Amino acid sequence: MAITMRTLVAFVFTIFFIISFVHSRTTTSGYGMLFDSVACEGGFEYCPRGGGNDKCTTFCRSLPNKYDFGVCDKIYACCCHINV
């Protein structure tokens, strides 16, 4: 009985491991990623102190790559993003 119970527990853990591995695996490029393309442009003029995401977004939309929006990071650089 103990060998059967031990085998059953090992089998159940093996099944859980296989399911979690397959479930978290990426099968296509870009799947599961928040952004496909990111470009950070340094420039204090686009990200004033205390934010400035609106000015950054305006700048990013004017670029040739037509980014969707911009976000100011902690060093006041404007990072432009394209949604997936």
Curated annotation (Swiss-Prot):
GO terms for cellular component: extracellular region. It comes from Arabidopsis thaliana. Its main location: secreted. Belongs to the DEFL family. Transmembrane segments: none annotated. The keyword Signal applies. Keywords: Antimicrobial, Disulfide bond, Fungicide, Plant defense, Secreted, Signal. GO terms for biological process: defense response to fungus; killing of cells of another organism. This is Defensin-like protein 199. Disulfide bonds join C40-C80, C47-C72, C56-C78, C60-C79.
